[in-house]
């Protein structure tokens, strides 16, 4: 029997999941790694911890399954996007900690580019906004701040990559410096329609092209693992950014189909077919994938904080463990007038305000831990609701249902709240780690074992959550939410 091995490298941990060709989970392994916050608004990872945790997870998944590497048809990668790394081409030594997608240190760089009137150019070429979220200004910051880095980059001595590229480099022993279009499309340097690095944007930012990885199709040939890593070489046949992998794993293959992945942040993607749809309101135009020789596009809306809101409750002592949030929040019927705006690192779509910060409003002497727990869940659900309706309107589609996956999708109360605040059913698949499943399916396609047309029949619904809240109540809650968001905006003052 042959298997597919998915490496799912996330913001807080690295996963490896072994699947059958039909998408059934055989074994799972996960290892967490440290987040570093050197200053407010700065978020970093140790590149070696990313690699070592991912390698451990891959070995452990095979061990738990009792499967040797020769039984693995192919390996695929899904990864946190935008996170930016640079390393020496000769030695593979990282030259700075990885700057994580959540990091806001380049807000002033983005503002300077906007003041130069460049937002329209970047939007037209990449589908993205000038925001610290994306890789380009992180890379520019490194080139300006790390001594000697620009000179070495111009001589071709330095590699830049997102996390997929860093993993590929290490899996292949430095033989492959590559990425796929979904990851490239999140850098602010990639032309959405030509599917190439954009020479004009590189000139505008002063980024040497010699730094950049080769772009290969999402189901392309990315080499094979070094024999000593997993016991024998394994072909690498699929690479996708994590949110695009989840869209594929939800079998959202047609225009108008979409999903929301609830991880550290919440990420909504709506498939728009073979042509990009350009939208306002903070929505992004992006690649869904490049599979079977064709590109598919999507609209994306990002909520920077989702599961991280529950993590914050735990860190400040309101919860013992994250999973306790559901039972605690069930102790109350509502949030008691409390609004929790989870803008710890700014606001994503539809607001895109890097200067916003988190806020809890409406506190009284009667507010309890349970009210705060429920308000945190509602804050994430409100944020997702704003994005979902904006996305459906921009694409000219009615919102009929939302497919949910990721860690928070295991929380029944949260999905009940999400359905109530959206006013449409929320569907949970049997395999909720659809990011890894999408990576597995991409590599199955790359290995010739699957086709896109096979995927809808392999997707299974596990649960359906129906809205029960009266429309008048929903509208009243949203009015309060909008007031709370306005209080959180523009909180950080430059200088």
From Swiss-Prot:
Catalysed conversion reaction: glycerol + ATP = sn-glycerol 3-phosphate + ADP + H(+)
Matches recorded under CDD domains: ASKHA_NBD_FGGY_GK (cd07769)
GO biological processes: glycerol catabolic process; glycerol metabolic process; glycerol-3-phosphate metabolic process
Pathway of action: Polyol metabolism; glycerol degradation via glycerol kinase pathway; sn-glycerol 3-phosphate from glycerol: step 1/1
Binding site for ADP: 11, 264, 307, 407, 411
Binding site residues for glycerol: 81-82, 133, 242-243
Keyword Nucleotide-binding carried by entry: yes
Binding site for sn-glycerol 3-phosphate: 11, 81-82, 133, 242
Recorded GO CC terms: cytosol
SS bonds (residue pairs): none
GO molecular function: ATP binding; glycerol kinase activity
InterPro entries (UniProt xref): ATPase_NBD, Carb_kinase_FGGY, Carb_kinase_FGGY_CS, FGGY_C, FGGY_N, Glycerol_kin
Top-level taxonomic group: Bacteria
Enzyme nomenclature, EC number: 2.7.1.30
Regulation: Inhibited by fructose 1,6-bisphosphate (FBP).
Keywords associated with the record: ATP-binding, Glycerol metabolism, Kinase, Nucleotide-binding, Transferase
Binding-site list for ATP: 11-13, 264, 307, 407
Family: Belongs to the FGGY kinase family.
Function description: Key enzyme in the regulation of glycerol uptake and metabolism. Catalyzes the phosphorylation of glycerol to yield sn-glycerol 3-phosphate.
PANTHER family: GLYCEROL KINASE (PTHR10196:SF69), SUGAR KINASE (PTHR10196)
The protein's name in its UniProt record: Glycerol kinase
Lineage: Bacteria, Thermotogati, Deinococcota, Deinococci, Thermales
The gene coding this protein: glpK
């Amino acid at each position: 029997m042959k298997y597919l091995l998915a490496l799912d490298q996330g913001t807080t941990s690295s996963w490896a999941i072994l699947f059958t060709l039909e998408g059934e989970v055989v074994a799972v392994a996960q290892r967490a790694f440290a987040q570093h916050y050197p200053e407010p608004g700065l978020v970093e990872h140790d590149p070696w911890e990313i690699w070592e945790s991912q390698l451990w997870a891959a070995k452990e998944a095979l061990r738990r399954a009792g499967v040797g590497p020769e039984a693995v048809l192919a390996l695929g990668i899904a990864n946190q996007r935008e996170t930016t790394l640079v390393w020496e081409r000769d030695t593979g030594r990282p030259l700075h900690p990885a700057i994580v997608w959540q990091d806001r240190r380049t807000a002033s760089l983005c503002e300077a580019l906007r003041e130069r009137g460049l937002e329209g150019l970047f939007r037209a070429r990449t589908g993205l906004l000038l925001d610290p979220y994306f890789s380009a200004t992180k890379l520019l910051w490194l080139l300006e701040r790390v001594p000697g880095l620009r000179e070495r980059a111009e001589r071709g001595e330095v590699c830049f990559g997102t996390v997929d590229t860093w993993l590929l480099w290490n899996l292949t022993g430095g033989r492959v410096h590559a990425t796929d279009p979904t990851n490239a499309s999140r850098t602010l340097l990639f032309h959405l329609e030509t599917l190439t690095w954009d020479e004009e944007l590189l000139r505008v930012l002063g980024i040497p092209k010699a730094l950049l990885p080769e772009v290969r199709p999402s189901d392309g040939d990315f080499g094979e693992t070094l024999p000593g890593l997993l016991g024998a070489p394994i072909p690498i046949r699929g690479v996708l950014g994590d949110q695009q992998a989840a869209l594929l794993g939800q079998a959202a293959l047609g225009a108008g189909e979409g999903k929301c992945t609830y991880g550290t942040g919440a990420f909504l993607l709506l498939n728009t077919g073979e042509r990009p749809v350009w939208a306002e309101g903070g929505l992004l135009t992006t690649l869904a994938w490049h599979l079977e020789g064709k590109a598919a596009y999507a609209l994306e809306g990002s909520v920077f904080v989702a599961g991280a809101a529950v993590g914050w409750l735990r860190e400040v002592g309101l919860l013992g463990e994250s999973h306790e949030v559901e039972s605690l929040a069930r102790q109350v019927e509502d949030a008691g007038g409390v609004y929790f705006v989870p803008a710890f690192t700014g606001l994503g779509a539809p607001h895109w305000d890097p200067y916003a910060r988190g806020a809890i409003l409406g506190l009284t002497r009667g507010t309890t831990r349970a009210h705060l727990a429920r308000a945190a869940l509602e804050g994430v659900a409100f944020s997702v609701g704003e994005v979902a309706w904006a996305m459906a309107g921009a694409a000219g589609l009615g919102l009929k249902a939302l497919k949910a996956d990721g860690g928070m999708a295991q929380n029944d109360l949260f999905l009940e709240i999400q359905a109530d605040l959206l006013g449409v059913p929320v569907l949970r698949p049997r395999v909720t780690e659809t990011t890894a499943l999408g990576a597995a399916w991409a590599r199955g396609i790359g290995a010739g074992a699957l086709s896109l047309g096979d995927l809808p029949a392999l997707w299974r619904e596990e649960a359906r959550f129906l809205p029960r809240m009266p429309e008048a109540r929903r509208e009243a809650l949203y009015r309060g939410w909008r007031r709370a968001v306005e209080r959180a905006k523009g909180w950080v003052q430059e200088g």
